[in-house]
């Protein structure tokens, strides 16, 4: 396997970068990542799901996007683990731009006049009630801010842990980075969304706790799947990147 950066150089010298590999699956993963990201954000605006029970006095309820959004962190783990932080950084920015673009398109649809028949059986009020969040400033800013901070936190933590663990204990890296990334993401998203009255402050603790615990739980349960996908990709792509000497500045796109 072509390890782009060898974690244990035989001669003790500084790790060096190998030749750029031909990536066969990378583009597909980008497409799936962006799809999951956009759908989960639309679902977050559309509905709040109630589990129907309480835990330690906290009602178990979360926005519907929470059902799918943890998968984006699994993709983030896979991207950083296999392809390294530098490629993941470009994917995170790609997702950010696509998410902003989808919000812009929904906003344009919202302000365009509705046809008479559509107004009768659906109407502007129904559109705004379900998709208004994705086309209004509050949910858009909350989504973009939470996503950006959370995904970069997740990727940086995983990349640095991979070096510290010398590539061992993948489960520790994926769960550990998710604990940090999801906490930052969830807190920022709920705070900003509540400031813009997307969610009532009365649900703040419930949404933060249930969203965070659910997302981390999904990551833990999906660890065997993550292992299988990571091992398969490393074998197919013939790459296993270690971020020695990487500039972790999110604004450096090279």
Model regions: which residues?
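Transmembrane helix-bundle signature of multi-pass membrane transporters/permeases
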Residues: 95-96, 144, 148, 171-183, ...
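Short, highly charged, low-complexity non-transmembrane loops/tails of multi-pass membrane proteins
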Residues: 229-254
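Membrane interface segments of multi-pass transport proteins and intramembrane proteases
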Residues: 161-174
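Transmembrane alpha-helix/helix-exit interface in multi-pass inner-membrane proteins
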Residues: 99-119, 147-151
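N-terminal membrane topogenic signal
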Residues: 17-32
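Alpha-helical transmembrane segments of multi-pass membrane proteins
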Residues: 34-50
């Amino acid at each position: 396997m072509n390890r782009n950066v060898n974690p244990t150089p035989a001669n003790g010298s500084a790790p060096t970068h190998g030749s750029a590999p031909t990536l066969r699956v990378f583009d597909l993963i980008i497409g799936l990542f962006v799809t999951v990201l956009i759908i989960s954000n639309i679902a977050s605006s559309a509905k709040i799901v109630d589990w129907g029970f309480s835990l330690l006095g906290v009602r178990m309820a979360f926005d519907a996007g929470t059902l799918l959004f943890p998968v984006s962190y699994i993709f983030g783990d896979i991207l950083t683990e296999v392809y390294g932080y530098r490629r993941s950084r470009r994917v995170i920015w790609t997702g950010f731009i696509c998410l902003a673009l989808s919000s812009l398109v929904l906003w344009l649809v919202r302000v365009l006049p509705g046809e008479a028949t559509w107004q009768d059986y659906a109407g502007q009020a129904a559109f705004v009630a379900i998709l208004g969040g994705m086309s209004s400033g509050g949910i858009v800013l909350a989504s973009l801010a939470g996503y950006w901070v959370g995904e970069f936190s997740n990727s940086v933590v995983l990349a640095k842990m991979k070096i510290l663990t010398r590539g061992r204990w993948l489960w520790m890296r994926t769960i550990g980075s998710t604990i940090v990334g999801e906490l930052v993401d969830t807190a920022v998203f709920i705070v900003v969304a509540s400031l813009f009255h997307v969610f009532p402050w009365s649900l703040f603790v419930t949404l933060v706790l249930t969203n965070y615990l659910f997302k981390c739980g999904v990551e833990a349960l999906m660890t065997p799947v993550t292992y299988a996908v990571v091992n398969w990709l490393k074998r197919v792509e013939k790459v296993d990147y270690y971020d020695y000497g990487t500039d972790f500045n999110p604004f450096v796109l090279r």
